[in-house]
UniProtKB/Swiss-Prot annotation:
It is found in: Periplasm. One of its GO terms (biological process) is amino acid transport. This is Probable amino-acid ABC transporter periplasmic-binding protein y4tE. It comes from Sinorhizobium fredii (strain NBRC 101917 / NGR234). Probably part of the binding-protein-dependent transport system y4tEFGH for an amino acid. The lineage of its organism: Bacteria, Pseudomonadati, Pseudomonadota, Alphaproteobacteria, Hyphomicrobiales. Pfam families: SBP_bac_3. Belongs to the bacterial solute-binding protein 3 family. Its main location: periplasm. GO terms for cellular component: periplasmic space. InterPro entries: Ectoine_EhuB, Solute-binding_3/MltF_N.
């Protein structure tokens, strides 16, 4: 019997994926024994309980479910490798699929133990959760209609003459606001899966996302393409580059610290590099991961 526990207060959008496969809502509810939340504070608590809950936002290539319900992606695979080094087997990971905007509130409410969504480290987020050291670094990208008839090659281009879609809770909102995009020209979608239809139907003129995400989406439909070449946005004189990491509840410092120790060792290996290359990350993006620390990113 699975160790899955579901809170009565868990958001309806969340889905639990025991042992890497999607569990139906009915099956999950049948396993409900109490309103006990996840929220493990220490690694020893996780081991004593027998499982760990990890939330993902179904975003390629970071962490997503394939057509068979298997959880895949660079973030998910790194989490598996690191946790295995800490004595937690992959089959003892309970995956939770939710929206990106629900990740931090879910951590704060102890609905899961950690996230594996490549969430960019930002000072305002550091006030709400704690992060591991970075395990990814990425620039920006943009999805446009096939042929790019309006010749969009930067967020600034769209800011001046079009509507741009972003995922709810994503960093791109901050960028659009800094670039002066009017609120009425910002289209918010719930998940990356909605990006192709938003652009293909003309609801939005472009979709702003991490470069790897935009590139992956472009491969999925002949109605859209990646805007190339693309110029990363410049805000306050700085080219925008993000560093992503795993996040934890603020009370879970012991769990985060133990995870960090194993992550930093794994980050030095060729296996780590090959894993990211296998998901389409550029060598220069992988090389940039150690350039920033979580402490620096939280304070700047």
């Amino acid at each position: 019997m699975t160790h899955l526990k579901i809170s009565k207060t868990a958001p309806a959008v969340a889905r639990f994926l025991p042992a890497g496969r999607i569990a139906s809502v009915a099956a999950a509810l049948s396993l409900f024994l109490s309103a006990q939340l996840a929220g493990a504070v220490t690694l020893e608590e996780v081991k004593a309980r027998g499982y760990i809950t990890i939330a993902i936002a179904n975003e390629m290539p970071g962490s997503y479910t394939d057509p068979n319900g298997e959880v895949k992606g660079s973030e998910a695979d790194v989490a598996r490798r690191v946790l295995e080094k800490l004595g937690i087997k992959p089959e003892n990971i309970q995956w939770v699929v939710t929206t990106f905007g629900s990740l931090i509130p879910g951590l704060q409410a102890n609905r899961f133990d950690m996230t594996a969504a490549g969430m960019a480290i930002r000072p305002e987020r550091c006030e709400k959760v704690i992060y591991s050291e970075p395990n990814s670094s990425y620039g920006e990208g943009m999805l446009v209609i096939k042929g790019n008839p309006r010749n969009f090659h930067s967020y600034e281009d769209v800011a001046q003459q079009g509507k741009i879609a972003i995922m709810a809770g994503a960093d791109q909102l901050r960028m659009m606001q800094a670039l002066g995009v009017p609120n009425e020209n910002i289209i918010t979608i719930a998940a990356n899966a909605d990006a192709i239809s938003a652009v293909a139907t003309g609801r939005a003129d472009a979709y702003a996302a991490a470069a790897s995400t935009a590139a992956d989406l472009a491969k999925k439909s002949d109605k859209v393409e990646l805007a190339t070449p693309f110029q990363d946005p410049v805000i306050d004189g700085k080219i925008q580059r993000s560093w992503g990491a795993f996040s934890f509840n603020k009370e879970s410092a012991d769990l985060r610290d133990k995870f960090n120790e194993a992550l930093l060792e794994f980050r030095k290996t060729d296996e780590f590099k090959q894993l990211l290359l296998g998901y389409g990350y550029l060598p220069e993006s992988i090389a940039a991961i150690p350039d920033k620390t979580t402490k620096e990113l939280c304070s700047n």
